[in-house]
Protein backbone atom coordinates (compact mmCIF):
# COMPACT_ATOMS: atom_id res chain seq x y z
CA UNK A 1 0.00 0.00 0.00
CA UNK A 2 2.76 2.43 0.90
CA UNK A 3 4.33 2.10 -2.55
CA UNK A 4 1.00 2.60 -4.31
CA UNK A 5 0.69 5.86 -2.39
CA UNK A 6 4.27 6.68 -3.37
CA UNK A 7 3.52 6.16 -7.05
CA UNK A 8 0.52 8.45 -6.79
CA UNK A 9 2.60 11.11 -5.00
CA UNK A 10 5.30 10.75 -7.64
CA UNK A 11 2.82 11.47 -10.41
CA UNK A 12 2.11 14.83 -8.76
CA UNK A 13 5.71 15.88 -9.54
CA UNK A 14 5.04 15.89 -13.28
CA UNK A 15 3.04 19.10 -13.60
CA UNK A 16 4.21 22.55 -14.60
CA UNK A 17 6.64 24.49 -12.43
CA UNK A 18 3.68 26.29 -10.87
CA UNK A 19 1.82 23.13 -9.87
CA UNK A 20 4.34 20.29 -9.52
CA UNK A 21 5.12 18.97 -6.04
CA UNK A 22 8.53 17.97 -4.69
CA UNK A 23 9.55 14.33 -4.63
CA UNK A 24 7.78 12.42 -1.84
CA UNK A 25 9.87 11.70 1.29
CA UNK A 26 10.08 7.99 0.47
CA UNK A 27 12.27 8.84 -2.53
CA UNK A 28 15.05 9.83 -0.12
CA UNK A 29 14.98 6.91 2.34
CA UNK A 30 13.56 3.80 0.66
CA UNK A 31 15.84 0.91 -0.27
CA UNK A 32 13.29 -0.17 -2.90
CA UNK A 33 13.38 3.24 -4.56
CA UNK A 34 17.18 3.19 -4.39
CA UNK A 35 17.24 -0.22 -6.11
CA UNK A 36 14.96 1.11 -8.84
CA UNK A 37 17.20 4.14 -9.35
CA UNK A 38 20.25 1.92 -9.68
CA UNK A 39 18.59 -0.33 -12.23
CA UNK A 40 17.06 2.43 -14.34
CA UNK A 41 19.19 5.57 -13.90
CA UNK A 42 22.72 4.33 -13.23
CA UNK A 43 22.89 0.97 -15.01
CA UNK A 44 21.28 2.43 -18.12
CA UNK A 45 22.12 5.40 -20.30
CA UNK A 46 25.06 7.68 -19.54
CA UNK A 47 26.37 8.67 -16.11
CA UNK A 48 28.48 11.87 -15.86
CA UNK A 49 31.78 11.36 -14.02
CA UNK A 50 33.40 14.78 -13.74
CA UNK A 51 36.19 16.41 -15.73
CA UNK A 52 38.59 14.70 -18.12
CA UNK A 53 41.52 17.05 -17.49
CA UNK A 54 42.19 15.55 -14.07
CA UNK A 55 43.67 12.56 -15.93
CA UNK A 56 45.99 14.44 -18.27
CA UNK A 57 49.13 12.27 -18.41
CA UNK A 58 49.59 8.77 -19.83
CA UNK A 59 49.07 6.32 -16.96
CA UNK A 60 47.00 8.72 -14.84
CA UNK A 61 44.13 6.82 -13.22
CA UNK A 62 41.24 7.30 -10.84
CA UNK A 63 38.94 4.71 -9.29
CA UNK A 64 35.25 5.05 -8.56
CA UNK A 65 32.10 2.99 -8.16
CA UNK A 66 29.19 3.37 -10.59
CA UNK A 67 26.03 1.70 -9.32
CA UNK A 68 28.13 -0.77 -7.33
CA UNK A 69 30.44 -1.54 -10.25
CA UNK A 70 34.12 -0.77 -9.48
CA UNK A 71 35.64 1.23 -12.34
CA UNK A 72 39.10 2.50 -13.31
CA UNK A 73 39.36 5.62 -15.45
CA UNK A 74 42.84 5.59 -16.98
CA UNK A 75 44.70 7.33 -19.82
CA UNK A 76 46.35 4.84 -22.16
CA UNK A 77 49.53 5.01 -24.22
CA UNK A 78 47.46 6.26 -27.16
CA UNK A 79 46.50 9.25 -24.97
CA UNK A 80 42.87 8.07 -24.91
CA UNK A 81 40.89 7.65 -21.71
CA UNK A 82 39.48 4.20 -20.98
CA UNK A 83 36.90 3.02 -18.47
CA UNK A 84 37.87 -0.45 -17.22
CA UNK A 85 36.32 -2.82 -14.72
CA UNK A 86 38.36 -2.54 -11.52
CA UNK A 87 38.28 -6.29 -10.93
CA UNK A 88 40.70 -9.00 -12.01
CA UNK A 89 39.46 -11.48 -14.63
CA UNK A 90 40.74 -14.33 -12.47
CA UNK A 91 39.02 -14.06 -9.07
CA UNK A 92 37.51 -10.59 -9.23
CA UNK A 93 39.96 -8.93 -6.83
CA UNK A 94 39.97 -5.12 -6.81
CA UNK A 95 43.01 -3.98 -8.78
CA UNK A 96 43.61 -0.31 -7.94
CA UNK A 97 42.60 2.09 -5.17
CA UNK A 98 42.31 5.87 -5.15
CA UNK A 99 44.17 7.71 -7.89
CA UNK A 100 47.70 8.07 -9.20
CA UNK A 101 49.88 7.16 -12.15
CA UNK A 102 50.95 3.68 -13.21
CA UNK A 103 52.76 1.90 -16.04
CA UNK A 104 50.66 -1.24 -15.59
CA UNK A 105 47.85 -2.75 -13.54
CA UNK A 106 48.83 -5.67 -11.30
CA UNK A 107 46.37 -7.74 -9.29
CA UNK A 108 47.40 -7.82 -5.60
CA UNK A 109 46.03 -11.36 -5.14
CA UNK A 110 47.71 -13.55 -7.79
CA UNK A 111 49.85 -10.93 -9.55
CA UNK A 112 48.05 -11.03 -12.88
CA UNK A 113 49.32 -8.11 -14.95
CA UNK A 114 47.38 -5.89 -17.36
CA UNK A 115 48.52 -3.08 -19.62
CA UNK A 116 47.06 0.38 -19.05
CA UNK A 117 44.70 -0.12 -22.00
CA UNK A 118 43.22 -3.08 -20.10
CA UNK A 119 44.76 -5.81 -22.23
CA UNK A 120 46.12 -8.90 -20.48
CA UNK A 121 49.93 -8.96 -20.24
CA UNK A 122 51.08 -11.84 -18.04
CA UNK A 123 50.32 -14.12 -15.09
CA UNK A 124 52.41 -16.58 -13.06
CA UNK A 125 52.59 -20.20 -14.30
CA UNK A 126 50.38 -19.95 -17.39
CA UNK A 127 52.98 -20.68 -20.07
CA UNK A 128 51.91 -24.30 -20.54
CA UNK A 129 48.15 -23.67 -20.68
CA UNK A 130 47.13 -23.26 -24.31
CA UNK A 131 43.46 -23.18 -23.36
CA UNK A 132 44.10 -20.30 -20.99
CA UNK A 133 46.08 -18.32 -23.52
CA UNK A 134 43.28 -18.68 -26.07
CA UNK A 135 40.72 -17.08 -23.73
CA UNK A 136 40.04 -13.37 -23.63
CA UNK A 137 41.55 -12.30 -20.33
CA UNK A 138 41.48 -8.56 -20.99
CA UNK A 139 39.76 -6.33 -18.47
CA UNK A 140 36.14 -5.48 -19.25
CA UNK A 141 35.76 -2.13 -21.02
CA UNK A 142 32.87 0.24 -20.43
CA UNK A 143 31.74 2.87 -22.89
CA UNK A 144 33.30 6.29 -22.20
CA UNK A 145 32.71 9.61 -23.99
CA UNK A 146 33.94 13.17 -23.48
CA UNK A 147 31.95 16.31 -24.26
CA UNK A 148 32.90 19.88 -23.29
CA UNK A 149 35.60 18.41 -21.05
CA UNK A 150 33.11 16.28 -19.08
CA UNK A 151 33.29 12.47 -18.98
CA UNK A 152 30.27 10.20 -19.40
CA UNK A 153 30.33 6.46 -18.73
CA UNK A 154 27.78 3.82 -19.65
CA UNK A 155 27.52 0.32 -18.21
CA UNK A 156 25.38 -0.80 -21.15
CA UNK A 157 26.94 -2.73 -24.02
CA UNK A 158 25.06 -0.64 -26.58
CA UNK A 159 23.99 2.66 -25.03
CA UNK A 160 22.23 5.30 -27.08
CA UNK A 161 24.33 7.94 -28.81
CA UNK A 162 25.83 10.37 -26.31
CA UNK A 163 24.97 13.43 -28.41
CA UNK A 164 21.32 12.41 -28.55
CA UNK A 165 21.39 11.86 -24.78
CA UNK A 166 22.84 15.36 -24.27
CA UNK A 167 20.48 17.12 -26.68
CA UNK A 168 21.06 20.89 -26.72
CA UNK A 169 23.57 20.81 -23.85
CA UNK A 170 26.43 22.31 -25.91
CA UNK A 171 24.17 25.00 -27.36
CA UNK A 172 22.90 26.23 -23.98
CA UNK A 173 26.43 26.33 -22.54
CA UNK A 174 28.12 27.84 -25.58
CA UNK A 175 28.62 31.26 -23.97
CA UNK A 176 31.34 29.81 -21.70
CA UNK A 177 34.69 28.23 -22.77
CA UNK A 178 33.93 25.12 -20.73
CA UNK A 179 35.91 22.63 -22.84
CA UNK A 180 39.27 24.22 -22.04
CA UNK A 181 38.82 24.79 -18.32
CA UNK A 182 41.20 23.00 -15.95
CA UNK A 183 40.64 21.46 -12.53
CA UNK A 184 42.85 23.10 -9.90
CA UNK A 185 41.39 21.58 -6.73
CA UNK A 186 39.39 18.43 -6.11
CA UNK A 187 38.22 16.63 -2.98
CA UNK A 188 35.88 13.74 -2.14
CA UNK A 189 33.80 13.27 1.03
CA UNK A 190 31.07 10.93 2.26
CA UNK A 191 27.80 12.42 3.53
CA UNK A 192 25.01 10.75 5.55
CA UNK A 193 22.06 11.59 3.30
CA UNK A 194 20.47 10.60 0.01
CA UNK A 195 22.32 11.65 -3.13
CA UNK A 196 19.33 13.57 -4.50
CA UNK A 197 19.26 15.81 -1.40
CA UNK A 198 22.65 17.21 -2.31
CA UNK A 199 21.78 17.86 -5.95
CA UNK A 200 18.38 19.35 -5.07
CA UNK A 201 19.91 21.99 -2.82
CA UNK A 202 22.64 23.02 -5.25
CA UNK A 203 20.10 23.74 -7.95
CA UNK A 204 17.59 25.95 -6.11
CA UNK A 205 17.87 29.58 -5.01
CA UNK A 206 14.96 29.42 -2.55
CA UNK A 207 17.19 28.84 0.47
CA UNK A 208 19.76 31.57 -0.26
CA UNK A 209 18.29 34.37 1.94
CA UNK A 210 18.04 32.03 4.91
CA UNK A 211 21.03 29.69 4.71
CA UNK A 212 23.52 31.98 2.92
CA UNK A 213 22.27 35.33 4.22
CA UNK A 214 25.74 36.73 5.06
CA UNK A 215 27.88 34.82 2.57
CA UNK A 216 26.57 34.72 -1.02
CA UNK A 217 22.88 35.71 -1.03
CA UNK A 218 23.52 39.33 -2.04
CA UNK A 219 25.52 38.18 -5.07
CA UNK A 220 22.63 36.36 -6.74
CA UNK A 221 19.56 37.85 -8.44
CA UNK A 222 16.38 35.80 -8.78
CA UNK A 223 17.14 33.44 -11.69
CA UNK A 224 15.24 33.16 -14.92
CA UNK A 225 12.90 30.24 -15.44
CA UNK A 226 14.66 27.06 -16.48
CA UNK A 227 15.70 26.82 -20.12
CA UNK A 228 14.07 24.31 -22.44
CA UNK A 229 16.30 21.23 -22.42
CA UNK A 230 16.16 18.57 -25.13
CA UNK A 231 18.65 16.34 -23.29
CA UNK A 232 19.10 14.68 -19.93
CA UNK A 233 19.82 17.84 -17.96
CA UNK A 234 18.12 20.86 -16.41
CA UNK A 235 19.63 24.34 -16.48
CA UNK A 236 18.86 27.92 -15.55
CA UNK A 237 20.67 31.26 -15.70
CA UNK A 238 20.69 34.08 -13.19
CA UNK A 239 22.37 37.46 -13.09
CA UNK A 240 24.89 38.21 -10.35
CA UNK A 241 26.36 41.30 -8.74
CA UNK A 242 30.02 40.43 -9.18
CA UNK A 243 31.00 36.78 -9.41
CA UNK A 244 29.22 33.78 -7.94
CA UNK A 245 32.67 32.29 -7.39
CA UNK A 246 33.43 34.52 -4.37
CA UNK A 247 31.81 35.45 -1.08
CA UNK A 248 30.04 38.82 -1.17
CA UNK A 249 32.66 40.26 1.21
CA UNK A 250 35.56 39.22 -1.04
CA UNK A 251 34.43 40.42 -4.48
CA UNK A 252 37.43 42.75 -4.78
CA UNK A 253 39.65 39.67 -5.28
CA UNK A 254 37.85 38.60 -8.49
CA UNK A 255 40.05 37.39 -11.34
CA UNK A 256 37.88 39.08 -13.96
CA UNK A 257 36.30 37.68 -17.10
CA UNK A 258 37.63 34.60 -18.81
CA UNK A 259 38.49 35.06 -22.50
CA UNK A 260 35.87 34.04 -25.02
CA UNK A 261 32.79 34.90 -22.94
CA UNK A 262 29.69 36.15 -24.69
CA UNK A 263 26.02 36.77 -23.99
CA UNK A 264 24.78 35.56 -20.61
CA UNK A 265 28.27 34.58 -19.52
CA UNK A 266 29.15 38.24 -19.07
CA UNK A 267 26.19 38.87 -16.77
CA UNK A 268 25.97 36.04 -14.26
CA UNK A 269 26.07 32.29 -13.66
CA UNK A 270 24.47 29.22 -15.19
CA UNK A 271 23.54 26.32 -12.89
CA UNK A 272 23.08 22.90 -14.50
CA UNK A 273 22.08 19.45 -13.28
CA UNK A 274 23.44 16.71 -15.53
CA UNK A 275 21.21 13.74 -14.82
CA UNK A 276 21.53 11.73 -12.85
CA UNK A 277 24.51 12.48 -10.59
CA UNK A 278 26.48 15.61 -11.55
CA UNK A 279 25.82 19.33 -11.24
CA UNK A 280 27.90 22.41 -11.94
CA UNK A 281 27.84 26.19 -12.05
CA UNK A 282 29.77 28.39 -14.45
CA UNK A 283 30.33 32.09 -13.78
CA UNK A 284 32.38 34.67 -15.67
CA UNK A 285 35.62 33.58 -13.98
CA UNK A 286 35.31 30.03 -12.64
CA UNK A 287 33.38 26.76 -12.72
CA UNK A 288 32.59 24.49 -9.78
CA UNK A 289 31.42 20.91 -10.28
CA UNK A 290 29.84 18.40 -7.90
CA UNK A 291 29.34 14.69 -8.40
CA UNK A 292 27.00 13.00 -5.91
CA UNK A 293 27.36 9.24 -6.34
CA UNK A 294 24.91 7.15 -4.29
CA UNK A 295 26.39 4.59 -1.92
CA UNK A 296 23.02 3.51 -0.52
CA UNK A 297 19.66 5.16 0.04
CA UNK A 298 21.00 7.20 2.98
CA UNK A 299 24.64 7.80 1.98
CA UNK A 300 26.39 9.48 -0.94
CA UNK A 301 29.96 10.12 -2.05
CA UNK A 302 30.43 13.74 -3.12
CA UNK A 303 33.32 15.05 -5.22
CA UNK A 304 33.89 18.78 -5.62
CA UNK A 305 36.06 20.12 -8.47
CA UNK A 306 36.95 23.79 -8.93
CA UNK A 307 38.01 24.81 -12.44
CA UNK A 308 39.57 27.87 -14.06
CA UNK A 309 40.57 28.95 -17.55
CA UNK A 310 44.28 28.35 -18.39
CA UNK A 311 44.83 32.11 -18.79
CA UNK A 312 43.57 32.61 -15.24
CA UNK A 313 45.80 29.84 -13.90
CA UNK A 314 48.78 31.57 -15.57
CA UNK A 315 48.27 34.77 -13.57
CA UNK A 316 51.05 35.47 -11.06
CA UNK A 317 48.64 35.76 -8.13
CA UNK A 318 46.65 32.63 -9.01
CA UNK A 319 47.91 30.43 -6.17
CA UNK A 320 47.05 33.03 -3.55
CA UNK A 321 43.73 34.26 -4.96
CA UNK A 322 42.42 30.81 -5.91
CA UNK A 323 42.40 29.96 -2.19
CA UNK A 324 39.81 32.72 -1.71
CA UNK A 325 37.62 31.05 -4.35
CA UNK A 326 38.06 27.70 -2.60
CA UNK A 327 37.02 29.36 0.67
CA UNK A 328 33.76 30.45 -0.96
CA UNK A 329 33.08 26.91 -2.19
CA UNK A 330 33.70 25.38 1.21
CA UNK A 331 31.83 28.07 3.15
CA UNK A 332 28.68 27.73 1.06
CA UNK A 333 28.81 23.94 1.29
CA UNK A 334 29.28 23.98 5.05
CA UNK A 335 26.25 26.25 5.34
CA UNK A 336 24.20 23.88 3.19
CA UNK A 337 25.09 20.86 5.35
CA UNK A 338 23.01 21.87 8.38
Locate the predicted segments by residue.
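C-terminal catalytic domain of Rieske-type non-heme iron oxygenases
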Residues: 74-75, 80, 86, 145, ...
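Rieske [2Fe-2S] iron-sulfur-binding domain
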Residues: 54-157, 163-171
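N-terminal short leaders/motifs
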Residues: 2-31, 93-106, 138-146, 216, ...
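Short Pro/Gly-enriched beta-strand edge/turn motifs at strand-loop
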Residues: 43-54, 123-128, 271-276
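Active-site region of the double-stranded beta-helix
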Residues: 38-39, 47-64, 254
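Generic structural signal for secondary-structure transition and capping sites
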Residues: 42-46, 93, 207
Amino acid sequence: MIYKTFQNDLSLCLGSADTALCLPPLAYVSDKVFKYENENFLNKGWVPTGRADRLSEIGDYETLDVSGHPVILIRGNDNQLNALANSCRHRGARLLEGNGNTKGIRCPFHSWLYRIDGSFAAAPRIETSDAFLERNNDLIHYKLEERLGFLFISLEEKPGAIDKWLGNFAELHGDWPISGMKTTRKWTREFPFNWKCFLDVFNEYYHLPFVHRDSIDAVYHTPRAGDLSTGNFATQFGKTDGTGGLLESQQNYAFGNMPGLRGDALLGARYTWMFPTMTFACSNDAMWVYEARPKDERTCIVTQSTCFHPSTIAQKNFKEVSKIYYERMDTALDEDII
